[in-house]
């Protein structure tokens, strides 16, 4: 079954810090794509200069919701790589639903 996973994760350091890593993160995210998962940065929500929340959308082939979320979260963390500390993972949010619903 195909699922749409929406990950919403604040970027530590705000808009400027995100601006310096945005392209590299997008490149790393694209490298995680396979026949089972397609990901991209969908949007950025900015609140002042010290806050930005990055929205990543993933289309995932999985057996169930838990597997879809696990695959998307793994791909996000892999794309973040050594810069994982640059994300406020404790404030991350996720939404998973069957594609087309």
Predicted regions, residues:
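Short amphipathic alpha-helices in soluble, non-transmembrane regions
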Residues: 20-29, 68-76
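Short, intrinsically disordered low-complexity segments
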Residues: 34-71
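Short, extreme N-terminal segment that most often corresponds to the first beta-strand
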Residues: 1-23
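Charged interaction segments
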Residues: 57-101
């Amino acid at each position: 079954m195909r699922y749409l996973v929406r990950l919403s994760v604040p970027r530590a350091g705000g808009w400027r810090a995100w601006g310096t890593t945005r392209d590299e993160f997008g490149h790393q995210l694209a490298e995680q794509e396979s026949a089972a998962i397609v990901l991209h940065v969908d949007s950025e929500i900015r609140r002042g200069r010290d806050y930005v929340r990055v929205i990543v959308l993933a289309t995932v082939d999985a057996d169930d919701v838990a597997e879809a979320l696990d695959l998307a979260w793994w791909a996000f963390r892999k794309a973040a790589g050594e810069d994982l500390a640059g994300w406020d993972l404790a404030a991350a949010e996720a939404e998973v639903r069957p594609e087309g619903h």
